[in-house]
Every structure is written in structure tokens, then in C-alpha cells.
């Protein structure tokens, strides 16, 4: 998008007065028609300066895309504070901005007002007015618009079918007919035989001009990205959920390019449609990616809070998915791509994104689907867009079988039933391997009967950073229960972890240590209806004694252990036995550390502790839960100062230590992994 000119405008005084003080009746008529473009005059200030200068004296914050080529300066999303979000406040704030800018003589164009998704508005104005806008009392933050891109450059149907259920043809448990899927993409050729009668092309269109031309090409001349994805989701022959209906929103131009603001307006269109005519379960497919966007992530959070399932492409940049939106939004199910050998998708020098913001992977290479070249044509395409379309189709089938599933329940089921440990992790950067889930999506063996299964997943925090007071924080989804907390540092310099309540929710905190390079907090998040959980803490016991913490309340069981300390190095500590005979399960900690027992009561819940230790230090020690049991807690017994941390991988507890060849460890510094395994007695 181009910006409105910011040069000084010298207009004759009579004409200026006529524009600003023209007949009120005429202006009211223009407003009623909805075609009146809000143009206000202003006075030039200075040339664009550094973004940091915008914060001087302002109460709001300014955000822009970290990737300069994707920025669209001159167009801004202004987001208001929720506490001030009266329905008329966005218009009032926009007009106040225009009135104040009028004294400075610029042109400001009001492009859109948000009501149904988040309180705010979209404006086109000079960057010189940003500081003025940031000072407005109701403004929370302002984000510069930026570009988003399509992420696309029948083995796939076989791959998503569990091996023991594979037949000569793809036979899904249902067609997903009770679910409506919204697709934000390019235009779609709805007359293609693969999707004819299954796609409704809405009248929504918000696309930027194509690069190098001022004219939009006809829909039939587009690159068929939207048509292909519609076929992957619900095509008659090559589709995943063959009975799902689709609604198409046109937010990407024929070059596969859109904007954050267009995606926002599209999401608000969906929310408004949901309010006007509530229907059954909704899935929104977001096969696009742009730079990290606070406002786009916030919009996804709002829509997910309204019960909508959002599935997004991780991105095709062979990079950390947390650097992109909407892939980085925690409320979005983010999907990476694999090939026919279950290996990460490679696209020349690029490939699938990865990291802690990815939930799982799905087929994304050489996917056969509908082509807009003709009504019977097919084409092969690759990318994380195709992978996300597979998961959207699987989600549609799961929601058709169980329409009351929440987002948290759906995500946990997708993770639980995925094929595990099939991806070659060596493809990922070394620092991302432990963070990236080794999961490839498959259909559940049955879309019913999982009601009593205990589902858990591992959630990694962002890296804390290297400062002394830096603290990493991992949190679960609102419908999940935090059952345990652990930490991990590649340097080994950390100060443990603990669970705290913040804003009415429990979070997992892990502080960095002096001289450390940063730390991760690792939360174990589970679905545990009717749970009553608490943390019991035992202070440091003193020299020569281990610290013990256990559950005090009757009926509560131990689900996790953690500990934290203030000193730089705890030193070595030879631990006693985990559970003295005749005593309940308990957490053991170093004598110099505070030890925390995470305890929960839930109907039918039972848990047990498993320990596996080695007499000499090893780089990795693991202990796994038996079939039918779910890992809820993972920790290391206090036996060595060389432990890097502990984390859960599916139902296996992993404890990592520094390379023994460089540590000078002794045989007394044993390493032990402690797993807490739980299940519902309804399944026993």
C-alpha cells in the first residue's frame, strides 16, 4: 500500500473553511451512505526518525514487522484498551485523532473500524503523526501494517491414516459434514468438480494491489493457491474431510500476497458472521505467514476465545516459527510440513519452519489437489499451507464426531494420536531440536471413546535471555491444568523452577543463574476436568539433609516435583531413597533448595512415581511410563551439579547432563530421572 502524501498543503482559506465547515446535512448524507472517506488536513512535522523516538512521552507502544521488506509504512492498526472499549470508542478516538491532526494539516484516511474482534481502527496516515496517536488516552498500542504471504511452493492421505488401519483406499471415519471451514486465501474456482457444491465464495474481499501493476487480475488467472487448498481440505477425490463445507474469504492477491490488516478484517468478518448466525463447530484455516504481529496474534486469541479453532501454516522460511504470525499465536494450532518419508520439507534453500511454536507436522510435499486451470485439472503443490490444510481436515472430522470439543481438547487429541519420533531431528538447527515436536499428524483410530483418556502435552517457554534477573515463563491454555514444572539450560547454569499464580492462572517460572546463557521453563499441561490442584513447598532443610515435600490433603496425589534455589551452585548431593517404605510419594530436593510438590485431586485419578538412575554421569537418562499411563511430571533427583535440566517428550522423562568428558565428574555424582505417571481408574 502507498502512503498518503505528507507534504505541506497550502489551500486558499475560503476553500479550507468550506471543506471543514461545509453543510452538516451534506456530510451526514455522505456518512450514511458509508462511502465518505475520512480525509483530514495536517501540518508536516519532520522526516521519519528511529522507532524508539516514538516512545518519548507516549503511554502506548508502537510495533512494526522485524523484516523490513515486509513493512507497509503509512498504514496502521490502532488498538484500544479493553477497559475503555465502549462500542462507540473506536469511532470517537479516530475522530479525536483526526481533529488534533487537522491543526497540523495532514490527510488521514480512516479505512476500517473494528467492533467484533478487538476495539480499534485502521488508518492511513503519515508516520509523523504516530507520536500524536500514541498519546491518545484510550490507545493501548499501534502496529504498522505488514505483508503476509501464501505458504505454498496421494501419499498424503495414506500417511495420515494410522498404519494398522490402512486399506487399499482412504477411508476416514466420517466426512466432517457437521463442520464449516473458513479459508483465508486467494480467490477460488468454485466450479471445479473436486469442490463444486462444497465451497461458498463469500463477498468478502480485501487484497492489496499486485506488485508491478495497478490492476487486479481476474480470479481465474490467479495461481490457484486457494483452489488447491480447498481441494485438500474437502475435495471429492483428494480431500481429507470430504464432507466439510468451506467458506472462502479473499485476502491474498494473485501473487499470493496480502496484509496483516486484510487478515484482521477477514477474521472480524468471521466473528461477525458467527454472532449474526451461530452455527456448529468452526475451523479457520490460515495458510499464510508474515512477520511477528502482536495485533494479529491478539485477534486470533479473541476468535479462539469465542470457540473457533484456528489452524495456521508454520511458514516456509526454514526458521523459528515463533518469529512469524499467525504461527506464533499460542491459541493457534501451528503446523509444519513433512515429505513422503516423514522428513522435514525442504524447498531449495528454504523449508518448513520449526521450533516450540509448532504443534505438529503434516504432509506438505507434492500434494495433489484441484487446479484452477480447468474444472477437472489437478496440480501438485508443496508447503506448510498444504500441511495446515490436512490438519484442518482432520480437525473437521474430529469435531463432527465430538462437536463439543474445546480447542484445548482438540489440540491434545491431535498431539496424542500423532505418529511419534519419525522425523530426523538432525535437519533442524541444534538449538531447536529439543524444542521442536517430533510429531506427524494422523487420524485417531476412532473419533469416539477417548473421554476418559488423560491427555498431556509439553509447553516450552521462550528463552529467558542471559541477564541475571531474567526469568522464563511457560503457561498452559485456559482449559488445561498445569501439573508440573521443570527447566532446562544448555549451559547448566540455572536456579531451578517453581509454579506460581499470576492473574488467576498458574504458570511455570524458571530463573536464569549468574553467568548463565539463559534458561527455558517447561510446563506439563494436561486435561483434567474437575481438578483441584495446589503446590506444597518445603524450605531448604540445611546441610547434610535432603528436602522433602509431599501432598498434605487427603485424596490428593502427587503429579509433579520441582525445586529452586538462590545460590550460584548447589554442589553435589547424594540423595536418599525416593520414598521410604510405608510413606506416600514425595519430592526429594537438595538440602539448599526449596522443594515443591504439585498435588491434585480429580475423580478417578491415580499416580505413581518411577525412577531410573545410573551410577555414573551420562549425557542423557530417561524413564518412561507404561502403556495406559500418562507422564504428568518429569524431574531430576539432586545427585549432581552437572544436570542441564529435565523435560517431557510424550510419555518419557528426559534428564540431560553436560558432556562427562569435560566435567570431571565422580562416580558419586549419579544422575537419576524421576517420572510421575498418572491415569484414570475408569480405564484401568
Swiss-Prot record:
Write down the required cofactor(s): Ca(2+)
GO MF annotation: an example: serine-type endopeptidase activity
Please indicate if the UniProt record lists Lipid metabolism as a keyword: yes
Q: How is it modified after translation?
A: Cleavage by furin and PCSK5 generates a truncated inactive protein that is unable to induce LDLR degradation.
**What top-level branch of life does the organism fall under?**
Eukaryota
Location of Phosphoserine modifications? 45
Could you tell me which InterPro entries the record lists for this protein?
PCSK9_C1, PCSK9_C2, PCSK9_C3, PCSK9_ProteinaseK-like, Peptidase_S8/S53_dom, Peptidase_S8/S53_dom_sf, Peptidase_S8_subtilisin-like, Peptidase_S8_subtilisin-rel
Q: Which family does it belong to?
A: Belongs to the peptidase S8 family.
Quaternary structure note: Monomer. Can self-associate to form dimers and higher multimers which may have increased LDLR degrading activity. The precursor protein but not the mature protein may form multimers. Interacts with APOB, VLDLR, LRP8/APOER2 and BACE1. The full-length immature form (pro-PCSK9) interacts with SCNN1A, SCNN1B and SCNN1G. The pro-PCSK9 form (via C-terminal domain) interacts with LDLR. Interacts (via the C-terminal domain) with ANXA2 (via repeat Annexin 1); the interaction inhibits the degradation of LDLR.
Designated name of the protein: Proprotein convertase subtilisin/kexin type 9
Task: Give the species.
Answer: Plecturocebus moloch (Dusky titi monkey)
